[in-house]
């Protein structure tokens, strides 16, 4: 686990930014998106090219190539869910999108966790312009598409909508677990209790 990263750090940052934008500008809008079938869509050749920009040891690259090529599914596409290397590869692959959003587009309030990301801003029109560019980039650079559920919506007390991200409904002063998250936890606890009782 990387220090200052992860679900809680992302939720803290989103909450802090939500407060800051609201105090500075009043209205707040959110662009929320995720990559469609992310792990199954990662292009092997592009992933290997990205790895070669960061790693220069031939033995290490041969080993990583073998891991990537051993992925089940369509030849040349997809990495298995759950592998530790897959998590590393997935983060490195979408680092290209992070750099594009932050450096090329100049987006300040951008947070990504694996294949889910949000962009916060006070101007809805600016978010719409960024959305068009962000939706083009993953396909042209990485052969990925954003999910059809991608949306821009107002956040705040005026419409009663919370910032829904990383399993939380995020408000300026507190966070609540999503109802689906609570249901999943209860279900797992019931299964665990049954397993212990058996």
Located regions from the model:
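Non-catalytic nucleic-acid substrate-recognition regions in nucleic-acid-modifying enzymes
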Residues: 4
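Conserved polymerase palm-domain catalytic core
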Residues: 8-9, 13-114, 118-149, 153-155, ...
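Active-site and adjacent loop segments of nucleotide-processing enzymes
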Residues: 164-198
């Amino acid at each position: 686990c990387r220090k200052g990263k992860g679900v809680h750090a992302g939720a803290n940052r989103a909450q802090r930014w939500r407060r800051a934008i609201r105090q500075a500008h009043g209205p707040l809008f959110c662009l929320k998106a995720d990559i469609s079938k992310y792990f199954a869509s990662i292009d092997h050749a592009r992933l290997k090219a990205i790895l070669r920009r960061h790693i220069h040891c031939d033995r290490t690259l041969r080993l990583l190539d073998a891991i990537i090529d051993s992925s089940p599914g369509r030849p040349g596409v997809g990495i298995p869910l759950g592998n530790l290397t897959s998590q590393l590869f997935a983060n490195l692959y979408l680092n290209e999108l992070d750099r594009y959003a932050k450096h090329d587009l100049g987006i300040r309030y951008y947070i990504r966790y694996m294949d889910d990301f949000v962009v916060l801003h006070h101007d809805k029109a600016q978010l719409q312009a960024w959305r068009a560019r962000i939706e083009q980039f993953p396909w042209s650079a990485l052969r990925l598409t954003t999910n059809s559920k991608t949306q821009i919506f107002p956040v705040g007390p005026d419409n009663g909508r919370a910032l829904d991200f990383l399993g939380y409904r995020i408000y300026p002063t507190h966070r609540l677990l999503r109802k689906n998250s609570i249901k999943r936890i209860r279900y797992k606890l019931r299964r665990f209790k049954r397993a212990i009782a058996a």
